[in-house]
Each structure stands twice: as C-alpha cells, then as structure tokens.
C-alpha cells in the first residue's frame, strides 16, 4: 500500500494555507479547511472546520500547512587538488653487463653502498626503461617512483619510517654492507645511506605528510560547510518548538491501571489528530523546506505524516516502561494495546523503535535529522523536481554524519545505526495505516476531523 498521498482534501487545503502564511515562534494559528483539493478530488462526508478558509495558489487549496520562507544561500564546497611531487633523479651508474634474464625476480645484482647497479644488457639499449622495473636500492621489483627514486614497497616504507620517526642507525661492520633483496634488512644504517645515495629525498616524505594533514583539514572544512547548508542546530530548534509539554503528565499517568477503560486506539487517534497540526509548524522550520514549490511541500507532508508522527512518539516514549507516551500526555500500556487487538503492531513499535532508540540513547538532534530524511522523500509521487528534494535529503545525511562524528567520536558506527531505524519506521508506518483504515471502516472508533481527512484522501497502491 502506498500511503504517500494520504493528506485528505481539507487537510491538504489547510496545509497549503499554512505553507503560505508566516509563523511566529510562540504560538500557532489554527489552520482553516477548504472543501476540495482540486479536480477529481471530492470529500465524502462534507467535513466542516470552524476555521475560516484561506486562499491558496494551488487548485483552490486552502490552509493547514503554512511554511515560513527560510532562504539560505547555497554553500559550495571546494575540494583542493592534491599537489604532485616531481623529482629528477640521475640514472644509477651501470656496468658489467650480465646475461639477459627473463624476469626481474631472477635479478640478484651485488648492490653495495657505492650505488653501482649491475644489470643485464638490454637488446634495445634503452637502459632507462629497464631500471624503472627494479628497485634502485635493493634490486627487488619496483612499484614506482617513491621520494624521487624507483624503488620497491619495502625500501619505500623503510625510508618513510626512518624520516618520519627521525631514526638513527649504526653499522656493525665497515659501513659498506651489501644491500640486496635478500640482505636488505641486515644493516639498517647501510640501507638508509643507500637510499640517500640513490637520490631519495627526506623533504619528499615531509611534504607527503603535510598533504595528508591538509586533506584532513579539508575534510573538517567540508563537514563544516555541509552543516552550514543544513544546520543541525535549526533542525533541533524545530523539534523543540513543537515538542508537547508532557513532562507534567508522565508521573500522573505512569500508574494508570493497564486495564483502564479508556480505549487505547481512541487515545492514539486523538493524539495523532492533535499532532497533525504541529507537523506543519515543524516542517516549516526545517531548513530549505519552505523554498520548495507549495505543491511539493503538500506532497511531502502527505507522503510522510504517519512515519513522522510515529518517530516522534517513539522517541518520547524512551523513558516509559512497556508503553508509549502520547502527545496528549496519556500513557498507553502494552497490555491495553493487546486487549484492544493491536498488540502485534504495538510490540513492533516497542522493540524496533522505542527499545533501539533507548539503547543507543538517541538524542533530539538525531531524531530531528531522521525525521527530516523522512520528510525529504524524493520518491513521493507527483513532485515537480525530485532531484531537488533528493539533494536536500543528501544534505541532511551529510549533516547528521558530521554531527555523529563530532558528538560521538568513540562510536564510529553510530550514523549507520541511526539510518537502520528508517526501514523499520517505514514498515511500521504502513502497518499502522492498515489498522487506521480498518477502524475507519468498521466505524466504532471516534476519529477526529484532521485524521479522518487524511484517511479519506485518495491514495495509490504499490
């Protein structure tokens, strides 16, 4: 079932008018309803709202999703190019040609500290090309030019360690030890002197280290730039601005008898209806959301309202044992949910969302980023520019990853663990909608205006 277009007629209308009206930080003006979404969409039941109808630029849609514009100039990130090192080296002195060999593995030249390299004669006489395939230090197979000299990985690593750690060596013999593939590790002093004699440059190692340092600094700058474009501080502010003041209710309701006569399904539906109003207020505080076309704003809210609400009450319920805490301040115990016939989906919420959030101590900034990822869904049907929405989602990803690395450096897998909650959230959201449709169908559960409109909106099956 595709639930992406579940914003009902009047609800979408209210969304539109809210999207076009400025908001204050302190209070929220009650949105008004409009009888239709546009051609082909009718509202059975003719639900009425006490709030006056506001005009909207889309197909006669009127109020609840107002959005304040929050233009932010795009920030570009520059990735510096890595400088290349160029070193000219003289070819080693060549003498005493040997018989030709078929492989460099067969080469065992007696290389001494004097740097004389004995290699076979090359039929073409192009000795420079031949020396590229062997290490100028020990005669092993060369992996390329390192610090100015063609050398193997072993000699390259030895020279780099020596320079970076500023090591000093002593020779036990006459400082003229044979350095070849088999004996290169016997005398570090002579091996290092051979590296210098063949042209390896200490400054090249230092420059390489500086480039690595510059890359790390650029990564930090890129992280900072990503956060400036989608600041997690503003996402947190959005969460705090619409957070229900349930703290005063928690203790009073924690002791509720699990067999309370209050119908948990009714309580949940009433809380959802209440939260639909604040969902608009939250969305327009998310960076760049209000810069999208009004039609796209409505589509995105239609597509994600159920997952957005479930994520909120799941995180709010972290401190609750075997139950969830609703926006109305009511505590619904799992036993009550089982008695009402919704125990299976209720248990999934507790185990796949609430418990996981509790175990990792998910904070409100992370919750807000996950909800913003849900909001910016480029797969929502009917978007005028899905690529733009996808770009905004990518910015949230980048900001969340940077936040996790900065706030929880000892948890390198935290970002991935957060994203793993999204598939569960999606699956649970779809199942909850199935239950809501069932309750609406049998008609024995009071469903308030806003939520009813959401369920009456046209939808598509997937």
Swiss-Prot record:
There is a cross-link at residue 108 (Glycyl lysine isopeptide (Lys-Gly) (interchain with G-Cter in SUMO)). It holds the Pfam family Hormone_recep. Expressed in lung fibroblasts (at protein level). Expressed in monocytes. Highly expressed in liver, also found in kidney and brain. The modification N6-acetyllysine is found at residue 145. Residues 11-24, 49-58, 78-104 have a biased composition (Polar residues). Residues 201-224 are annotated as: Hinge. Residues 206-218 have a biased composition (Basic and acidic residues). Residues 227-458 form the NR LBD domain. Residues 160-165 are annotated as: Nuclear localization signal. InterPro entries: NHR-like_dom_sf, Nuc_recep-AF1, Nucl_hrmn_rcpt_lig-bd, Nuclear_hormone_rcpt_NR2, Nuclear_hrmn_rcpt, Retinoid-X_rcpt/HNF4, Znf_hrmn_rcpt, Znf_NHR/GATA. It is found in: Nucleus; Cytoplasm; Mitochondrion. All-trans-retinoate binds at residues 316, 327. Residues 1-134 are annotated as: Modulating. One of its GO terms (cellular component) is nucleus. Keywords: Acetylation, Cytoplasm, DNA-binding, Host-virus interaction, Isopeptide bond, Metal-binding, Mitochondrion, Nucleus, Phosphoprotein, Receptor, Transcription, Transcription regulation, Ubl conjugation, Zinc, Zinc-finger. Residues 135-200 bind DNA. Residues 1-107, 206-228 are annotated as: Disordered. GO terms for biological process: cell differentiation; hormone-mediated signaling pathway; mRNA transcription by RNA polymerase II; negative regulation of transcription by RNA polymerase II; nervous system development; peroxisome proliferator activated receptor signaling pathway; positive regulation of bone mineralization; positive regulation of cholesterol efflux. Homodimer. Heterodimer (via C-terminus) with RARA; required for ligand-dependent retinoic acid receptor transcriptional activity; association with RARA is enhanced by pulsatile shear stress. Heterodimer with PPARA (via the leucine-like zipper in the LBD); the interaction is required for PPARA transcriptional activity. Heterodimerizes with PPARG. Heterodimerizes (via NR LBD) with RARB. Heterodimerizes with NR1H4; the heterodimerization enhances the binding affinity for LXXLL motifs from coactivators. Interacts with NCOA3 and NCOA6 coactivators. Interacts with coactivator FAM120B. (Microbial infection) Interacts (via the DNA binding domain) with HCV core protein; the interaction enhances the transcriptional activities of the RXRA/RARA and the RXRA/PPARA heterodimers. This is Retinoic acid receptor RXR-alpha. It comes from Homo sapiens.
């Amino acid at each position: 079932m595709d639930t992406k277009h579940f914003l009902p007629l009047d609800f979408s209308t209210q969304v539109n008018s809210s999207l076009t009206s400025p908001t204050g930080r302190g209070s929220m003006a009650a949105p008004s309803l409009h009888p239709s979404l546009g051609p082909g969409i009718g509202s059975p039941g003719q639900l009425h709202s006490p709030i006056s109808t506001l005009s909207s630029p889309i197909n006669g849609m009127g109020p609840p999703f107002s959005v304040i514009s929050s233009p932010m100039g795009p920030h570009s990130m520059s990735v510096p190019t890595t400088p290349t090192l160029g070193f000219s080296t003289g070819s080693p002195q060549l003498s005493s040609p040997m018989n030709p060999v078929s492989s460099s593995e067969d080469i065992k030249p007696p290389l001494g500290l004097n740097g004389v390299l004995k290699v076979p004669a090359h039929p073409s006489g192009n000795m420079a090309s031949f020396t590229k395939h062997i290490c100028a230090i020990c005669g092993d197979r060369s992996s390329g030019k390192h610090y100015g000299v063609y050398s193997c990985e072993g000699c390259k690593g030895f020279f780099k360690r020596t320079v970076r750690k500023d090591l000093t060596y002593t020779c036990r013999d006459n400082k003229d030890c044979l350095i070849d593939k088999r004996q290169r590790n016997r005398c570090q002093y002579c091996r290092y002197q051979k590296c210098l004699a063949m042209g390896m440059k200490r400054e090249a190692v230092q420059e390489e280290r500086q480039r690595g340092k510059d890359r790390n600094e650029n990564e930090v700058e890129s992280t900072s730039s990503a956060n400036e474009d989608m600041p997690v501080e503003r996402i947190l502010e959005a969460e705090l601005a619409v957070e229900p003041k349930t703290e005063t209710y928690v203790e009073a309701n924690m002791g509720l008898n699990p067999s309370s006569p209050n119908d948990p399904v009714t309580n949940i539906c009433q809380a959802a209806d209440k939260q639909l109003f604040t969902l608009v207020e939250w969305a327009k505080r998310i960076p760049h959301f209000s810069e999208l076309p009004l039609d796209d704003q409505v589509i995105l809210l239609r597509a994600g309202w159920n997952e957005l609400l479930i994520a909120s009450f799941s995180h709010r319920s972290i401190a609750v044992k075997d139950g969830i805490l609703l926006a109305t301040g009511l505590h619904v115990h799992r036993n009550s949910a089982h008695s009402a016939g919704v125990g299976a989906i209720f248990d999934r919420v507790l185990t796949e969302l609430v418990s996981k959030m509790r175990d990792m101590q998910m904070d409100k900034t992370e919750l807000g980023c996950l909800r913003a990822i849900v909001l910016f869904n480029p797969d929502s049907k009917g978007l005028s520019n899905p690529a733009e929405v996808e770009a905004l989602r990518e910015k949230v990803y980048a900001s969340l990853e940077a936040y996790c690395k900065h706030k929880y450096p000892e948890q390198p897998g935290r970002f991935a663990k957060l994203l793993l909650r999204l598939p569960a959230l999606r699956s649970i959201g779809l199942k909850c909608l199935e239950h809501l449709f069932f309750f609406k169908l049998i008609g024995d559960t009071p469903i308030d205006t806003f939520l009813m409109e959401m369920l009456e909106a046209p939808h598509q099956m997937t």
